[in-house]
From Swiss-Prot:
Stated name of the protein: Functional amyloid sbunit FapE
Localization: Fimbrium; Secreted
Origin superkingdom: Bacteria
Keyword Signal: yes
Amino acid sequence: MNTSRWLTALCLAASMPAYAASAFKPIEMSDAELAELRGRFVMPGRIISFGIVMSTTWTNAAGDTSTVSANMHIDSSTITPQFYVQSTGSVGNGTNRDPGTGTVVGGAGLGSGQGVTQTVRAAGDGNTAYNNVGINVSENGLSPANVAQSGHALMAGGSFTTESAAGRVSVSANNGGVQMAIAAHNNQGNALQQIGGGNVLQGTVLQGNSNFVNNMTQLNVALGNNGLNAGALNCNLDQLKGLRTLGY
């Protein structure tokens, strides 16, 4: 056995992890740097449709239900993007419609958060509340079939209000964003959703008992499968190589 060769091999093997760790030591990127990379590899020509769906449902202890939804779909055939609002409701079979007696205080700064802000504040018993934000990206190269745009057309600066079984529904379009809310009957609480200015807010206040609330906002993006040309690919590869010098 050649002892010197074995010793050389062991020394090389032991040094490789240390060398790799020093060459590819990760560093933390700031929020500003991440913002510069956001969407970098989704070329504008590949996005063939974009849509937003928002919905809020409130069901009280008696089974009374109110649902409000707003949706917008944009593709190559869209002339003027706008939201369409629908509201439905049904009366439950229960008899428990006692007024809520809970009190929720504070929260004045919740509407000034950046990014996605989700809150549930409760002063009752047996309540259930969900806040959901989803992003659905499809790459099949086909735009989703145009859903018949029905309901109330919400113009910029306009609003929509109606009474429903479980509460009063309101939707408004202001300052480049959309806000929807349900103010539940009998002091049971309220639910709010708001999107605009790069921020999403979802909040629920529960002052009664045995309520079920669901807030949902979903962004839908469809990408074409035509791919990137050679120039765009080289540009993206050069950007990735640039990260190598920073430790990636």
